[in-house]
Regions:
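C-terminal motif of bacterial Sec signal peptides marking the signal peptidase cleavage site
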Residues: 14-18
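Bacterial signal peptide processing site
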Residues: 20-23
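Extracytoplasmic small-molecule ligand-binding "clamshell" domains
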Residues: 30-152
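Extended ligand-binding regions for polar small-molecule ligands
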Residues: 37, 41-72, 204, 271-309
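Short loop->beta-strand "edge-of-pocket" segments that line small-molecule binding or catalytic clefts
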Residues: 88-91, 109, 190-206
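Acidic, polar ligand-binding/catalytic clefts
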Residues: 117, 121, 128-192
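A ligand-binding cleft/hinge motif common to bilobed small-molecule-binding domains
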Residues: 155-164, 233-266
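Periplasmic-binding protein-like
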Residues: 173-181, 248-287, 307-321
């Protein structure tokens, strides 16, 4: 509408000038408003359901002794995977440090990618016997339930709500939800988000935690964290809030932003598994115990996450049986 009015004024000015008037030339300026990335929207509804608050979200199924690679128990979920010839893992391609595509090689890489490869190694003796299936945050439960993937290793925070529909391994990494804002913006605490526009990816626990802030910010959901960063760069939001590990990856892409504030919430990451495949959950927990004890977890941390600070060491597993 504004553009149409400006153009009418411009045409009128030309007409006046054509009649011999001494009216000065009219300067026309059309302001371009960048559209939100595809799938991004402002949320005004109430907070998502929290699920069974009484569950122990970090407790998983205790592993037994790991079978040798290539010798999975007959009739097990792992034997079916071995018969297929590859592990299918749902992963991310837009989260630097955990799961992103190397621009030089085109290969997916990161801490989560290597955790998935260790599961493949334990089944086949070869970490390359794996198919990496890119899934977005909102697809994680559905691809597990449908059997499209065997596991999801995608900065997947364990929650009671999610445990109602899928199963999880023990915790393999614990992150903290923080804030990413422009340097000098004055936004450096959760309280500073009051009334501000904040982006988080739809379907994530980060989004849920923003609803709990009081006063509440204006919450925007996007499809990927890269979209959130684009919205911050274009001035469409004032901050991003999610796990510090994810925010550090975004900050590497833009030197004008910084990770700030104390922890808003703890975010324990687990490997997602179909709820009917308890044997695979126990197997994955055996793999996590093994790589925690033999130094592999620490090697992966040093390779991908060292810039996050001193290693906390592999999380202590907690089991419910």
């Amino acid at each position: 509408m504004r553009t149409r009015i400006l153009l009418v004024l411009f045409v009128f000015a030309l007409a006046v000038a054509g009649c011999g008037s001494t009216v000065a030339p009219v300067s026309v300026s059309v302001s371009a408003v960048e559209p939100l990335p595809a799938g991004a929207t402002e949320f005004t509804a109430t907070a998502p359901a929290a699920g069974n608050a009484d569950c122990d979200r970090e407790a998983s199924w205790r592993p037994g002794p790991l079978p040798p690679p290539g010798a999975m128990p007959p009739g097990s979920t792992m034997a079916a995977i071995a018969e297929r010839g590859r592990l299918i893992a749902g992963v991310d391609q837009n989260t630097d440090l955990f799961g992103s595509r190397n621009p030089a090689t085109g290969q997916l890489e990161g801490f989560d990618i290597d955790i998935a490869r260790e599961i493949a190694r334990a089944i086949f003796g070869d970490p390359d016997r794996i198919q990496l299936r890119v899934v977005n945050a909102k697809e994680r439960e559905s691809v597990l339930q449908s059997g499209e993937v065997d596991v999801v290793v995608r900065t997947y925070s364990i929650t009671c709500e999610r445990k109602d529909v899928v199963d999880f391994s023990a915790v393999y990494y614990e992150a903290n939800q923080k804030i990413l804002s422009a340097k000098g913006s004055g936004i450096d605490t959760a309280a500073g988000l009051a009334g501000k526009r904040v982006c988080a990816v739809s379907g994530t626990t980060s989004l849920s935690k923003l609803y709990e802030l009081n006063p509440r910010p204006k919450i925007y959901g996007a499809t990927t964290w890269t979209d959130c960063l684009l919205m911050l760069q274009q001035g469409q939001v004032d901050a991003i809030s999610t796990d510090d590990a994810v925010l550090k990856g975004l900050a590497k892409q833009d030197p004008t932003v910084d990770v700030v504030g104390d922890s808003i919430a703890k975010e324990p990451y687990g490997v997602g598994v179909n709820k009917d495949h308890q044997d695979l959950v126990r197997f994955v927990n055996g793999v996590l115990e093994k790589i925690g004890q033999d130094g592999t977890w620490q090697r992966l941390y040093d390779s991908w996450l060292e810039e996050l600070g001193p290693s906390p060491g592999p999380p202590e597993p907690r089991y419910k049986d």
